[in-house]
């Protein structure tokens, strides 16, 4: 089974507001960079989309070390998701899970692989995390420009 390292990040200008996600995938000495964004979103949604998009880009089941600076993603995938699934994607107080469709997509994506999750401190000089952050900002930029253009009209 191939062993892939993934580094993800999300960014948002305003929360909600224009947002982007970025991911760096590394297999041996081959590296792939990905990014995307949305016009009106939240930072948490972008963090989730980064992980989902990166895992879905893998064409076959892999051993994955996924690195994120998002406590939301780390806590959700390692602590909260089991109860949400047991409760039909509802929280302990029976409310729908926020970003439930993304959590379900992440659960499906991770189940195709053997994923080990790692938390890294954001903006602390971790080169791959910094690159994922740059990619997330790049993914957000077209939506920020569109918002600025709308403000001038």
UniProtKB/Swiss-Prot annotation:
InterPro entries for this protein: RNase_H, RNaseH-like_sf, RNaseH_domain, RNaseH_sf, RNaseHI
Cysteines engaged in disulfide bonds, as pairs: none
Domain RNase H type-1: 1-141
GO cellular-component term (any): cytoplasm
Annotated localization: Cytoplasm
Amino acids binding Mg(2+) 1: 9, 47, 69
CDD domains for the chain: RNase_HI_prokaryote_like (cd09278)
The protein's Enzyme Commission number: 3.1.26.4
Reactions catalysed: Endonucleolytic cleavage to 5'-phosphomonoester
One Gene Ontology term from the biological process aspect of the record: DNA replication, removal of RNA primer
Cofactor(s) required for function per UniProt: Mg(2+)
Ranges of biased composition (kind: Basic and acidic residues): 125-153
Keyword Phosphoprotein annotated: no
Enzyme class: hydrolase
Keywords per UniProt: Cytoplasm, Endonuclease, Hydrolase, Magnesium, Metal-binding, Nuclease
Keyword check for Hydrolase: yes
Domain of life assignment: Bacteria
Sequence positions that bind Mg(2+) 2: 9, 133
GO MF assignments: magnesium ion binding; nucleic acid binding; RNA-DNA hybrid ribonuclease activity
Disordered: region residues: 123-153
A Pfam family reported for this protein in Swiss-Prot or TrEMBL: RNase_H
The record's free-text note on cofactor binding: Binds 1 Mg(2+) ion per subunit. May bind a second metal ion at a regulatory site, or after substrate binding.
Family according to the record: Belongs to the RNase H family.
Subunit organization: Monomer.
Name of this protein: Ribonuclease H
Upper lineage: Bacteria, Pseudomonadati, Pseudomonadota, Alphaproteobacteria, Hyphomicrobiales
Gene: rnhA
């Amino acid at each position: 089974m191939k062993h892939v390292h993934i580094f993800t990040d999300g960014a948002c200008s305003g929360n909600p507001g224009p947002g982007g996600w970025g991911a760096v995938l590394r297999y041996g000495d081959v590296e792939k960079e990905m990014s995307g964004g949305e016009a009106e979103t939240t930072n948490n949604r972008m963090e989730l989309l980064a992980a989902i998009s990166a895992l879905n880009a893998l064409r076959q089941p892999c051993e994955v070390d996924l690195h994120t600076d998002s406590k939301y993603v780390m806590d959700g995938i390692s602590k909260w998701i089991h109860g949400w699934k047991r409760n039909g994607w509802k929280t302990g107080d029976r409310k729908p899970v926020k970003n439930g469709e993304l959590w379900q997509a992440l659960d499906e994506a991770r189940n195709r692989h053997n994923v080990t999750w790692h938390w890294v401190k954001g903006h602390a000089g971790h080169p791959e995390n910094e690159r994922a952050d740059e990619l997330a900002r790049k993914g957000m930029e077209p939506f920020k420009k569109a918002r600025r253009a709308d403000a001038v009209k």
